[in-house]
Regions:
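Extracytoplasmic gate region of multi-pass secondary transporters
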Residues: 11-12, 190-246
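Extracellular/periplasmic helix-loop-helix junction of adjacent transmembrane segments
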Residues: 12-42, 229
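Helix-breaking motifs and short loop linkers at transmembrane-helix boundaries and internal kinks
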Residues: 23, 55, 76-82, 110, ...
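Conserved MFS/SLC helix-loop-helix module at the cytosolic interface between two early adjacent transmembrane helices
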Residues: 42-80
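Cytoplasmic membrane-interface "Motif A"-like loop-to-helix N-cap segments
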Residues: 53-63, 254-265
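Cytoplasmic helix-loop-helix junction between adjacent transmembrane helices
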Residues: 86-123
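Helix-loop-helix hairpin linking two adjacent transmembrane segments in secondary transporters
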Residues: 121-165
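C-terminal membrane-cytosol helix-exit motif in multi-pass small-molecule transporters
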Residues: 154-173, 362-370
Length: 382
C-alpha cells in the first residue's frame, strides 16, 4: 500500500515539472491525471471483483507487476498521448490491487477491530503519498520529473518478492458458495441503503482528496507559495491523515462511523475554505493542510474499514472494489473540475470555497447512516 499510495498520487507532484519541460500549462495535463484515475476506476469495477472467484493473492501479485513496470515506462513518455495511455494502464493495475489488499486485511482481523486494522494498514498508502511528495520536492529539481516515476516503480519491483513469499490467500468460510453475480448481493439482504450511502461517501471524499493531491501544489503556487513549500503542504495532508487514522479507527470501532466521521469531515471543510485565505503565509497554510489531512485522508482510511466490515467474505472484494470504483469516478471529477476552474481563471479563494462542499456531503451521508441496518459482518466472518 505504501508504493500504491506513492504511485496513485505522483502525477500531482510531477505535473509542474512536466509542464515546464514540455512548455505547456499545468491545466493542459488534466487528461493525464484523469487517465490514471479512469484506469483505477476500471480496475476497481472489473478487475478487483475477480478475486472473489479466483483468489485475492494471485490478483494482487499480477496487479503489482503491471503498475510497477508501467510506472517506470511512464518516465520515458515523450508526448501527451503516450503519457495518457501509460497512466491509464497503470491505473488499471492499481485499481485491481487496492480493494483486495483491504479485503485481505479485513479477513485476517478480528471483527470488533476491523475498522482499526484496515485504517492502520491503509495509512501506509498515505505515508507513501507523503513520502512521494517529499521525494519529489528534492528529486525533481535535481534529476527531473522522470526520477520520481522510476523510483516508485523500482520500489514496487523490489517489494514484489516479499509479497510472493509472505502474502496469504484469502479466508473462505466452509460451505460458502461463490456468488455468480456478486454485484447484485450488494443490494440484497438489507444492504441497499448502506451501499448507497457508502458510495456517496466514497464519491464525495475521493473527489475532494484527488482534487487536492492533483492541484494543491499548483493552487498554492498561484497564491505565492514556493513550489517546494506547496509540495510539502501536500505531504502534510498525507501525514496528518496517517496520524488521524490511528486515532479515529478505534473510535469508529467503538462508537460507530456515524458518530465519529462527520466531525472529521467538518474539520476538513473548514480548513479547505481556510487554506484559500492563507495567501502566501506558509505557517498558516501548513496548519490548514494538517486539518485537511485529518478530515480527508484520515477519514478515507476509516471509510475503507467501514466498507470492508459491512460486506461478508464472499462479496468483500466486490463491495470494497465497487465502493472504491464509485469513489474513483469522484476522483476523476475532482481534478477535471479543478483543471477547468484553473483554466478559466476563477479566483483561487472561490475554488477552495467550492472544494469545501464535498466533505459536508460526506458528513451528511454518515449522519443518515444512523437509520441504516447494523454494520456487523455476516456470522461466518466472526
Amino acid at each position: 500500500m505504501f508504493v500504491e499510495g506513492y504511485d496513485a498520487q505522483l502525477m500531482g507532484f510531477v505535473v509542474p515539472g512536466i509542464a515546464r519541460d514540455w512548455g505547456v500549462s499545468p491545466a493542459s495535463l488534466t487528461s493525464a491525471i484523469a487517465a490514471g484515475l479512469i484506469g483505477m476506476t476500471l480496475g476497481a469495477f472489473f478487475i478487483a471483483p475477480l478475486a472473489d472467484s479466483y483468489g485475492r493473492r494471485r490478483l494482487v501479485l499480477y496487479s503489482v507487476i503491471i503498475f510497477a513496470l508501467l510506472t517506470i515506462a511512464t518516465a520515458f513518455a515523450q508526448s501527451l498521448p503516450m503519457l495518457v495511455g501509460l497512466r491509464l494502464l497503470t491505473g488499471i493495475g492499481l485499481g485491481g490491487a487496492m480493494p483486495n489488499a483491504i479485503a485481505i486485511t479485513a479477513e485476517f482481523s478480528p471483527s470488533a477491530k476491523r475498522a482499526s486494522a484496515v485504517a492502520a494498514m491503509f495509512s501506509s498508502y498515505s505515508v507513501g503519498a507523503g513520502f512521494g511528495a517529499i521525494l519529489a520536492a528534492h528529486f525533481v529539481p535535481l534529476y527531473g520529473w522522470g526520477s520520481v516515476l522510476i523510483s516508485c516503480g523500482g520500489m514496487a519491483l523490489l517489494l514484489w518478492p516479499a509479497l510472493l513469499i509472505a502474502m496469504p490467500e484469502s479466508y473462505v468460510p466452509k460451505g460458502e458458495a461463490k456468488p455468480k453475480i456478486p454485484v447484485g448481493r450488494l443490494f440484497s439482504e438489507g444492504r441497499s441503503w448502506i451501499t448507497i450511502l457508502i458510495w456517496v461517501i466514497f464519491f464525495a471524499n475521493l473527489m475532494e482528496l484527488f482534487f487536492l493531491t492533483s492541484w494543491l501544489p499548483t493552487t498554492l503556487g498561484a497564491q505565492g507559495v514556493s513550489d517546494r513549500a506547496a509540495v510539502l503542504a501536500t505531504a502534510v495532508v498525507q501525514f496528518a491523515g496517517v496520524a488521524a487514522a490511528f486515532t479515529m479507527g478505534p473510535l469508529v470501532d467503538r462508537f460507530g462511523p456515524q458518530r465519529v466521521l462527520p466531525a472529521a469531515f467538518l474539520i476538513a471543510a473548514l480548513c479547505i475554505a481556510g487554506i484559500g485565505l492563507a495567501g502566501a503565509e506558509v505557517v498558516f497554510t501548513m496548519v490548514m493542510a494538517f486539518g485537511i489531512g485529518i478530515g480527508t485522508v484520515g477519514a478515507q482510511n476509516c471509510n475503507n474499514g467501514v466498507a470492508a466490515k459491512f460486506y461478508p467474505t464472499s462479496i468483500r472484494a466486490t463491495g470494497v472494489g465497487w465502493a472504491l470504483a464509485v469513489g474513483r469516478v469522484g476522483s476523476i471529477v475532482g481534478p477535471v473540475v479543478g483543471g477547468i476552474l484553473l483554466s478559466t481563471k476563477v479566483d483561487i479563494r472561490t475554488i477552495f470555497l467550492f472544494a469545501a462542499v464535498p466533505p459536508l456531503l460526506a458528513a451528511g451521508a454518515y449522519l443518515c447512516m444512523g437509520r441504516a441496518p447494523n454494520l456487523e459482518p455476516a456470522a461466518s466472518d466472526n
